[in-house]
Amino acid sequence: MDEQLEQIEGVVEDIIYENEDNGYVVFEISGGGVLTVVCGIVGELHAGESVICRGRYENHATYGRQFHAQECETDMPKDLEAVYAFLASRSLPYIGARTADKIIDMFGAEALEVIANDPARLTKIPGISPDKADRIQQEFKRMFGMRELIAYLAQFEISPRKAMEVFKAFGVGAMQAIASNPYLLCGEPLQLDFRHADSIAQYYHMEGDCAQRLEAALLRTLRHNAGNGHTCLPRAQLLATASNFIHQPPEKLARALDHCIETEELAVKMFDAVPYIYLPDLLAAEQDIADRLNLLAKRGKNTARDLDKNIQILELTQGFAYAPLQREAIRKAMTENCLVLTGGPGTGKTTTVNAILQLLENQAERVALCAPTGRAAKRLSELTGRKASTIHRLLEVDYTGGVVSFIHNDKNLLKCDVVILDEMSMVDVKLFQALIAALRYTCRIIMVGDADQLPSVGAGNILSEVIRSGCVPTVCLNEIFRQAKRSLIVENAHHIISGEPLQKGSKTDDFFFLETDGEAAQRLVCDLVTTRLPRSYGFDPIRDIQVLCPTKLGPTGTQALNVELQNLLNPPQKGKPQLQSAARVFRVGDKVMQVRNNYEIVWNRIGGEQGVGAYNGDIGIVESINLRERSMVVRMDDRRLLYPAENLNELEIAYAITVHKSQGSEFPAVILPVAQVPPRLCYRNLFYTGVTRARRLCVVAGRRDVVNSMMSNIRQNLRYSGLCALLQAGQPPEQLSTGGEDS
């Protein structure tokens, strides 16, 4: 227990607010003649219960002094008055104040013992049947079973919030399940820290090389690496990594791995005579993608009548001629069943997509435009003048029972003839698998993206793997058009990819480099955001300017810069509400970002439409804060979302974000600090992605040697994936090509 925590105890008098999903409660307790307001994630509480709370007092301007509980122990009501208060609180089914009187009259202070251990005796009360008595007992056991679990897991430093998730996963049998195999906590859907499971295993004197621990380590290693983008790992690397993680010999882990493969907990696939180990769902995803793309590639070509004539008509209408590669892309889009269209900034991808859209619409084809993120979808809509949605919105998320699925799937197909998917480099294998499953057999796919950008945050490297396979028709646009040549952002983006020296630029250009280092770099970035760029260019420092950092750490990492920028742009003021969640402080007016997908959170669109879902990378502004309920309203574009206390950990301050989190977005002005970049993040694709997020202005601030190092390091993040091999395995050798512009 933290020695700094204060302790109070008493009897629950009233429940002011309660969130049943996560156990956040605001309640009043009486003890020592004092009534205290307590709030925190403490699980389910009811009037009449005795509690011991540990935490700290906080003072709020609106709600006064209240106790924020970090730990809460509850005890079954014992004296007659407390037992009656509990029964009369309608916490149990079929029991209200009148029935509570009858139960107390018959059983007195032993009433709860009767409910827990001998519910048949309740049938002596008029109106309580045997079925009702059983229901009362079940609810009582559920209620106090959760309390018991929270207290049990607290000794292993597992929070009440996590304990409630465990209870949801395993129910009243949670403690027995955990005792038999603590490593269940590390698996789906909980994925608790391995050290918690180790602590419980040691409590039960389980050996460090027991089968449950070895197998859990293998699964955890694969899941962890899936979070780093790998869909699979070579067998030898998996064994070595897991061995280092749990300090057990690879030979023992090899036997556990063989058992996991036998029981189909894991899957193995041979690529170039090397065994690769998969989580089964990721192998299924890559195999489904390969099968569908090969099927589309093998299907007969579509007939597009008078295609060249219609392209010429478009050129006359637009007042310009398409470049040869653009014409090639347009032809392939109209005749092939799947196409990859790739190219850097300024090479005419948008112009090409608009031409394809016009020709498809002239043929009365139903086209679905989509992108992986809300910002990317909004940008696609602005560039094409047509409705575009996120992939999640297109498929319609169904989160019934806490499991993500989609309303549109292989049993309920999308009603479209062509899908155009932008920002393809950001799409992970699970999401793309879901999309292709919902497409009709005859539906065509056009994948648009920049293969030189960072790959998806999730597992997979689809765009690069598809291009590398040579199995899918691909056109790579590489000509920079005249209007784009005027932009140093575009010109330098291509210099980065080709490894040529950057043009430094000046204040009259849309790109310039400022040399700086150390703490001076932090001061420069803050000055650019708060003063220089708003004064010189008229940018709003919060809405228009985005700092993109290669890393979270260091003076010019997101963590340090967000503290500085928040205090400069949105400092604390008397009367301005602010809310602390863990190490973060949120204030009205702060720029915030969603950092993980939430498929349940409700939003209201300005204009009346309602929906659900906030996704990793969505950015918004805090509009209001409710201190009593510890909740916030955040506006994201034209949507307002209510974040209750339990969801605040899904938000981060976002004046500065990582380059990885910026994928799929564009900002009027970007500041890219590169004074200190860790070697593992010092590579060309990351620098390129950061620069190409800027629409009107890009300022690179840092050391020239760091810039040169990033530009010269052509290694991309290594990602283990079998998609290229699976695609090629499904194609006859004569159909394979190099994946270049003529493929």
Which role does the model predict for each range below?
Residues 3, 24-30, 37-38, 46-57, ...:
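Accessory alpha-helical DNA-binding modules that contact the DNA backbone or grooves
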Residues 4-19, 55, 619-623:
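Structural detector for short beta-strands of small beta-barrel domains
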Residues 18-28, 628-633:
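Short aromatic-glycine-enriched beta-strand elements
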Residues 272-418, 467, 471-482, 489-516:
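ASCE P-loop NTPase motor cores of helicases and related translocases
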Residues 366, 415-418, 442-446, 697-698:
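Loop/turn-to-beta-strand initiation segments
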Residues 423, 449:
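Walker B catalytic acidic pair
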Residues 451-612:
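Conserved helicase motor core of P-loop NTPases
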Residues 606, 616-743:
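C-terminal accessory regions
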